[in-house]
């Protein structure tokens, strides 16, 4: 079974979803292990190794203090994405456990948890996606990223969690955020961000998504707020509820898929924006 344990060589496979780095052979660090050890020991995947190397362990008191501090900072300045990310790690464990269970109960979700794919410029061949037909999800994703001058490398690493698998679920949420924007056809302006936060809140269930949606709306200008209440909010609540569970979608296997077919498959409703 191929695991994404190392991303050493960029390889473009002409099958749907394989526009990312794969490891042909796993390097376990030794040529052979004793038979009993080999059966008992499972190789640690690359994500877990990297996470444990950078993990910052907290006591319960430290976690409470960090949660309170990041909450206040995020309320004072919703642009503090670092504080919002920190808040998500220190308060979102029950929701992440629910998401993980949902993924385990889905064939596609289980495969994601097993492979632990990453989305960044080291693992996704953006140039290859750019050469796909314009109607494909992969082409639309690259076009979205270029239009709004976004890089997939900008997502913060998860550091303050105890469980590596839950840390991956949080990482997966962060790294697929722009894919959600793409498939819902929603821009990255303030109105679009608040709307997508509502979609994610309803569909995924992370507390930080609810917080971002509620408090982000206070930053809207009066004219934007009217448009938000009349069009964007009703759409976001409806779209988040109707869509298939977004965390169970193996997006990387959909690069070559027609984006309208993908939307139909995932039951995604697109709002016509000005």
UniProtKB/Swiss-Prot annotation:
Enzyme category, top tier: lyase
Membrane protein topology class: Peripheral membrane protein
Subcellular location: Mitochondrion inner membrane
Alphabetic keyword roster: Lyase, Membrane, Metal-binding, Mitochondrion, Mitochondrion inner membrane, Transit peptide, Ubiquinone biosynthesis, Zinc
Example GO biological process: ubiquinone biosynthetic process
Chain segment of the transit peptide: 1-20
Matches recorded under InterPro entries: Coq4, Coq4_euk
Cofactor: Zn(2+)
Region (Disordered): 13-40
Polar residues composition bias: residue spans: 22-36
Record text on subunit structure and interactions: Component of a multi-subunit COQ enzyme complex.
HAMAP family, A to Z: Coq4 (MF_03111)
Role description: Lyase that catalyzes the C1-decarboxylation of 4-hydroxy-3-methoxy-5-(all-trans-polyprenyl)benzoic acid into 2-methoxy-6-(all-trans-polyprenyl)phenol during ubiquinone biosynthesis.
PANTHER family, per the entry: UBIQUINONE BIOSYNTHESIS PROTEIN, UBIQUINONE BIOSYNTHESIS PROTEIN COQ4 HOMOLOG, MITOCHONDRIAL
Protein name: Ubiquinone biosynthesis protein COQ4 homolog, mitochondrial
């Amino acid at each position: 079974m191929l695991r994404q344990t190392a991303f050493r060589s960029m390889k473009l496979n002409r099958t749907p979803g394989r526009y990312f780095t794969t490891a042909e052979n796993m390097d376990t660090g030794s040529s052979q292990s004793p038979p009993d050890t080999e059966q008992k020991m499972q190789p640690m995947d690359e994500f877990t190794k990297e996470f444990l190397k950078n993990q910052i362990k907290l006591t319960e008191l430290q976690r409470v203090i960090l949660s309170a501090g990041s909450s206040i900072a995020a309320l004072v300045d919703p642009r503090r994405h670092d504080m919002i990310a920190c808040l998500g790690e220190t308060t979102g464990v029950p929701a992440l456990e629910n998401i993980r269970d949902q993924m385990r109960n889905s064939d596609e979700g289980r495969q994601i948890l097993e492979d632990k794919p990453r989305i960044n410029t080291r693992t996704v061949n953006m140039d290859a996606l750019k050469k796909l037909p314009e109607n494909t999800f992969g082409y639309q994703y690259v076009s979205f990223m270029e239009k709004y001058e976004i890089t997939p490398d900008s997502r913060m690493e998860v550091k303050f969690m105890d469980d590596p698998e839950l840390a991956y679920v949080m990482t997966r949420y962060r790294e697929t955020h722009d894919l959600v924007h793409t498939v819902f056809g929603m821009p990255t302006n303030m109105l679009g961000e608040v709307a997508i936060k509502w979609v994610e809140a309803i569909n995924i269930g992370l507390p930080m998504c609810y917080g971002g949606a509620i408090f982000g709306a206070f930053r809207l200008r009066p004219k934007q707020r009217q448009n938000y209440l009349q069009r964007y909010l009703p759409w976001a609540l409806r779209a988040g509820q109707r869509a298939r569970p977004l965390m169970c979608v193996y997006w990387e296997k959909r690069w070559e898929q027609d984006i309208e077919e993908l939307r139909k498959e995932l039951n995604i409703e697109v709002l016509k924006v000005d």
